[in-house]
Design a protein with these regions (language model features):
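Hydrophobic pocket-lining residues that define ligand/cofactor binding sites across diverse proteins
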Residues: 110
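Extreme N-terminal basic, low-complexity initiation segments
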Residues: 2-10
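Exposed boundary/loop context
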Residues: 4, 19, 206-208
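Short, positively charged and aromatic/hydrophobic N-terminal segments
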Residues: 10-13, 17-38
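Extended, low-polarity segments enriched in aliphatic/aromatic residues
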Residues: 43-102, 113-121, 126-343
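Generic low-complexity segments that are intrinsically disordered, proline-rich and/or Lys/Arg-biased
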Residues: 7, 18, 23, 56, ...
Length: 343
């Protein structure tokens, strides 16, 4: 339960943000462990960790390689197999996304084992530089992701318009029976997620699960996950700046005679971009259960992506910005850099 974290992320004092986020993460991790042990009786995977301290002669890239090897990436049979490395290429203007140097370390490890790696992501629901494959590829290149820097190609998994998808079953799905995933991701023999931890206006925070569950969904898949609830406007707080309307990819926001924002619920897709766009906290989710439902659907989508094939996960806890890398800006980190996790 991450209730309360989104509001804290918008608070003006970083000390409050840090305290709330820290304890919510602890609560969430404890609940996950308890749920996993009690309901599924599964043994938790070992997670390997290294900090960001680097003695002379050792780089962060060296440490990333070592922690990946320690966590077992070389135990995966990759010979002649396609390896999807799922990551976020960053919206243009955002500088909190993972550097392409990290992607090259993972891609090189795959190639050393005979694998055929490619970097991948799916298109977005909202306006920006990643709403179709052509602009998405241009964005990735401008942010440094191309073969000369990463050692492998970039493929936008759900195609030109975000409609190239595979509908796959969700194992024991309670909220989604099937998941609509970018086809190139499901065509891969092996799946690797490469992400960094950060805040998020709807889910509280985002990391590996969000990178997989929401990130691998096609446009239709993203809409299904967001469909649990739509935002509303507290008009007394609205300043009529029109930022929310510029961010809306569904043309769902108009303005009344008093220049106050109004959301057409029949057009709204529930993506939450307007919530992050508003600097005055005038737009909010109708109920906490909507975000809770989003979290659960996202987890089920992640399960569908990973089921039935070898998977490996890398999460760098650095550049912990208040919002996700989908924004065209990034605020100062709300926590110091911590380290690298791999499993």
């Amino acid at each position: 339960d991450v209730e309360g974290v989104p509001a804290a992320l918008y608070d003006s004092t970083f000390s409050l943000q840090k305290d709330v986020l820290y304890y919510k993460i602890r609560e969430y991790a404890a609940a996950c462990r308890a749920n996993k042990m009690e309901e599924t009786a599964m043994e938790a995977s070992k997670v390997y960790y290294t900090d960001f301290r680097c003695p002379v002669g050792t780089s962060l890239l060296d440490k990333l390689r070592r922690v990946c090897i320690a966590a077992g990436i070389k135990d995966i049979d990759m010979d002649g197999k396609f390896v999807a490395i799922k990551m976020h290429f960053g919206e243009l203007g955002n500088l909190a996304f993972l550097r392409p140097n990290y992607a090259k370390v993972v891609a090189d490890l795959c190639k050393e084992q005979g694998g055929l790696p490619f970097l991948t992501d799916c298109n977005t629901l909202y306006p920006g530089s990643r709403k179709n494959a052509l602009e998405h590829l241009t964005c990735a290149q401008l942010n440094g992701f191309w073969p000369m820097t990463t050692g492998c190609q970039v493929i936008i998994a759900d195609g030109l318009r975000g409609t190239d998808e595979a509908e796959v079953p969700v194992p024991n799905g309670e909220y989604c029976k099937t998941a609509k995933i970018g086809r190139a991701i499901m065509d891969a023999d092996i799946f690797i997620s490469l992400t960094h931890f950060k805040g998020h206006e709807s889910t509280g925070f985002g990391g590996t699960l969000k990178n997989i569950g929401m990130g691998c969904g096609s446009r239709a898949g993203k809409m299904i996950q967001h469909a649990a609830g739509h935002p509303e406007v507290q008009q007394s707080l609205c300043r009529g700046c029109h930022r929310c309307a510029k961010e809306c990819g569904s043309d769902a926001i108009t303005y009344d005679a008093n220049n106050k924002a109004v959301i057409d619920q029949t057009k709204c897709k529930g993506c939450g971009r307007c919530i992050g766009a508003c600097n005055f906290d005038a737009i909010y989710s109708q109920c906490d259960s909507a975000n809770e439902m989003l979290d659960r659907k996202m987890a089920e989508y992640a399960a569908a992506v990973c089921a039935g094939r070898p998977c490996f996960h890398v999460s760098l806890v650095q550049d912990i910005s208040p919002n996700c890398d989908c924004h065209c800006e990034n605020d100062a980190p709300i926590l110091p850099d911590i380290g690298i996790f791999a499993s």
